Amino acid sequence: MTARSTIDVSRLSTYAFGHRSLMWWATIGMIAIEGTVFAIAIVAYFYLRGLSDAWPPSGAPPDLLFGTINTVILLASGIPNHFAARAAESENLRSVRLWMVTCLVLGLAFQVVRALEFTTLNTHWTANAYGSIVFALLALHTTHLITDFIDTAVLTVLMFTGPLNGRRFVDVNENADYWWFVVAAWLPIYFTIYLVPRFFP
C-alpha cells in the first residue's frame, strides 16, 4: 500500500475575496436568479402594453421628479459602496465603518424618496393592468432595496461591535456586489416606467 501524499494547508487563509470565495459565487447565483425575475417583470410590462390601446390608460405617465431623484441617489450611492468594498479588501476597519455609514444614509434617503415616489405614479395598483405592473416593478425593486439596506445596517453594526474577523470584511465586500445589482436593476426599471410612456407612446 502506498502512502498518501498530503499538503499542509494550515497556513492558508480561512477566507477569500472575489471568485475565490464561495459566498461570491452564491451572491452571483442569487443576482442571476433575481435579475431574471426583474427581466420577466419588465417583459410583462411590455406584453401588457402591447395589449392596450392607450398606455398608460389614464394618459398621464408617472411624475418624473421622485423617480429621477432616486436615480441620482442610487448612482451616487455607488461611490461609498465602491470605497467600502475596497476598504474591506484591505481590511481597513476605520474606512469600512465610514463608507458603510455613508451607504446607510444614502439607502435611507432612497427609501424616503421611494415612499414619495409611490404617491406620484398617477395610478393605483388596483386601477388596471398598467397600475398593477407599475406597482409590481416598484415593489419588486423596493423589496430588494429594503433587504440590502437591512443587510448593510447589520454589517455596519457588526463593524462597530464585533466580532471582527477577515470573514466579516468579505461580507462587506459581497454586500457591495449585491448593492451594485440593486443599482443596475433600477436603471431599466426607471427607463420602463418613466421614459417609455413619454418618448415611446
Task: State where each predicted segment sits.
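...captures the hydrophobic TM-helix bundle architecture rather than a specific catalytic motif
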Residues: 1-201
